[in-house]
């Protein structure tokens, strides 16, 4: 039987309008704060108001938003992306996130809504603000560089189950 690796996927929404993207992010932060407040009587009116603002803003930027589905790369391809985008200056390796994102997008994008040419997405990376590119970078980085070692969790679970069985 041939082994088959199932690579993780993640969706990221890219809002091309920087100002609106920042407004959505700020409202998201406000919503988190409002939700974390302990409201004892009735519903959290502030959270509802902020949520409605986010939905309204989302509708306004619908035509300027691209949902990108990324799939993790095999290690050898991820290494090639990093090596191609690393330069050494005075013995110090340096990388530009926008260049890594552009190259990774060419290999990692499996779907876009609305349908958008992958090359167009790669080319727009140098035009994005830090706030716009950050969610893309975090998705790419986490899909390809996050340590996944379930051994400790499996061993801990086994010890706990054995202890409970012995009791």
Question: At which residue positions do the language-model features occur?
Answer:
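Short, surface-exposed, charged amphipathic helix/loop patches that serve as local interaction elements
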Residues: 21-167
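Short, intrinsically disordered N-terminal pre-domain segments
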Residues: 1-6
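Predominantly late transmembrane helices and immediately cytosolic-facing juxtamembrane segments
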Residues: 11-17, 21-23
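Nucleic-acid-interacting cores, centered on viral/eukaryotic replication and modification enzymes
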Residues: 8-10, 142
């Amino acid at each position: 039987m041939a082994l088959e690796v199932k690579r993780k996927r993640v969706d990221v929404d890219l809002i091309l309008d920087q100002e609106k993207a920042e407004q959505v992010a700020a409202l998201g932060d406000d919503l988190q704060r409002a939700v974390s407040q302990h409201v004892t009587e009735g519903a959290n009116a502030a959270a509802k108001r902020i949520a409605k603002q986010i939905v309204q803003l989302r509708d306004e930027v619908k035509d300027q938003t691209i949902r990108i589905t990324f799939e993790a790369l095999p290690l050898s391809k991820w290494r090639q992306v990093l090596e191609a985008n690393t330069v050494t200056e005075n013995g110090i390796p340096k990388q530009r996130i926008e260049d890594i994102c552009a190259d990774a997008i060419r290999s990692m994008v499996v779907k876009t809504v609305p349908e958008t040419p992958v090359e167009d997405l790669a080319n727009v990376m140098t035009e994005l603000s830090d706030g716009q590119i950050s969610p893309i970078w975090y998705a790419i980085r986490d899909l390809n560089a996050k340590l996944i070692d379930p051994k400790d969790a499996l061993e801990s679970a086994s010890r706990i189950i054995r202890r409970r069985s012995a009791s």
